[in-house]
Design a protein with these regions (language model features):
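Acidic, Gly/Ser/Thr-rich repeat motifs that build Ca2+-stabilized beta-propeller blades
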Residues: 1-152, 187-190, 194-203
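A short, polar/proline- and glycine-enriched secondary-structure boundary/capping micro-motif
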Residues: 26-28, 154-156, 209-211
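Loop-centered beta-sheet repeat module
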Residues: 151-204
Length: 220
């Protein structure tokens, strides 16, 4: 992944966010695009120091390889939500969500932060498999995918959010598991009228999946 970026619509414009936490507003008019930087504190949530095994990663070189950083953005009701890999110290990581009201400057605050972590000392640790896709869900909540970082046992454990799709309350960050047994779900969409969601994920060597959850009754 070379400095991946994410976009979503806000009114008639786009907000364009790089994996390194730089945000631009993109105005579309007369077949021309104009970009203007948006001041924010987003980069403050991202890793500034790296362990030796990841020493080649440099967020401030746009051509460097980055396995951490922002994983998705989602805009709804004048708020922007961003998922990212949070550093909990002592070589522990997991996927978290922050939010900001959309104003001239974006001040992000923590919305959801897991209580379990994945250690980078694990032999097969892979931050690429972190999920992070965000979509609207019902009852004033979001859907978030969280990968298992190649800790395969976590996907079936109800004590871990890894290898799961969870719903998160937009106001207080409370969450519940709505689907488990995933590897690295990255595609996600919810269909409100029919009340079901679809997720996709990569298999290790082929074997990609499309999963339908058609019974979300009682899930919030």
């Amino acid at each position: 992944e070379v400095n991946t970026a994410y976009i979503d619509f806000h009114n008639e414009d786009l907000l364009y966010t790089t994996k390194s936490g730089i945000i631009f507003r993109v105005k579309i008019s007369d077949k021309k695009l104009s970009l203007s930087p948006v001041k924010s504190n987003l980069s403050e949530y991202l890793l500034k120091k790296f362990e030796e095994k990841n020493a080649s990663i440099n967020y401030y070189n746009p051509y460097s390889v980055s396995k951490f950083g922002i994983k998705d953005i989602h805009i709804d009701d004048n708020y922007i939500y961003a998922s990212y890999i949070e550093d909990f110290g002592s070589n522990l990581y997991n996927t978290s969500v922050i939010k900001a009201e959309i104003k001239d400057s974006l001040i992000f605050k923590k919305l959801f932060s897991p209580k379990n972590y994945i250690s980078s000392k694990m032999k097969e640790f892979s931050p690429i498999q972190s999920g992070g896709r965000i979509r609207n869900f019902k009852n004033d909540s979001l859907l978030l995918t969280i990968g298992e970082y190649r800790d395969r046992s976590a996907a079936q454990s109800l004590k871990s959010v890894n290898g799961k799709i969870i719903s998160i309350n937009k106001k207080n960050g409370g969450y519940r598991i709505v689907s488990l047994g995933h590897r690295n779900p990255q595609g996600l969409d919810y269909y409100n009228e029919e009340d079901y969601y679809v997720s996709t994920e990569h298999g290790p060597f082929g074997g990609d999946e499309i999963n339908f959850n058609i019974n979300t009754a009682g899930q919030k």
